[in-house]
Amino acid sequence: MSLTLEPSPNRNLKIGRIASVVLLGGFLATSLASCASVASVDAAPDAANPACAEMMVVLPEVIGDAERRPTSSQATSAWGDPSQVVLRCGVEAPGPTTDPCVSVNNVDWVAHEDKSGIWTLTTYGRTPATEVVLDPNVIPSSTVLATLSDSASRIPAQKQCTSVEKAEKF
């Protein structure tokens, strides 16, 4: 006597439902785990400039120990949660200033410190300009500028900072 076991339709239906629930649960867990909070950053006036897009696509995923996360506006980026570094492309290019200007990897940055110690570093001589805001007590400006200068250099330089020594000769 031979016995043939046929799977019951109810059993297959239960297995299918269980598999669907397991797959859906795994998908949701993975999706939620990989979601970083969105940083609210206002877009700069010239954020739609095509030169910003060329720079934005080559921004690094990490600065120091801070990972890049999504932002709420075009041509913006943020690293860290809470944000340690915030970048906006399309800000107004700075004119002549007495604020210090540093050159990092052939990109000039004008540095401005506010009363609370937060620094705003803006590319000089590039249009559109790129603005980076950071707290140097949380992440070193040297790390930030060294990491971002390659991306910022995608917007061609039209001017350079003038050193104090060169300015005194005029």
Q: What residue spans do the PLM features occupy?
A:
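Short, charged/polar surface micro-motifs in flexible loops or helix N-caps
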Residues: 91-98
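C-terminal motif of bacterial Sec signal peptides marking the signal peptidase cleavage site
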Residues: 30-34
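Extracytosolic low-complexity repeat regions of secreted or lipid-anchored proteins
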Residues: 100-170
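Bacterial signal peptide processing site
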Residues: 36-39
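N-terminal secretory signal peptides
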Residues: 41-91
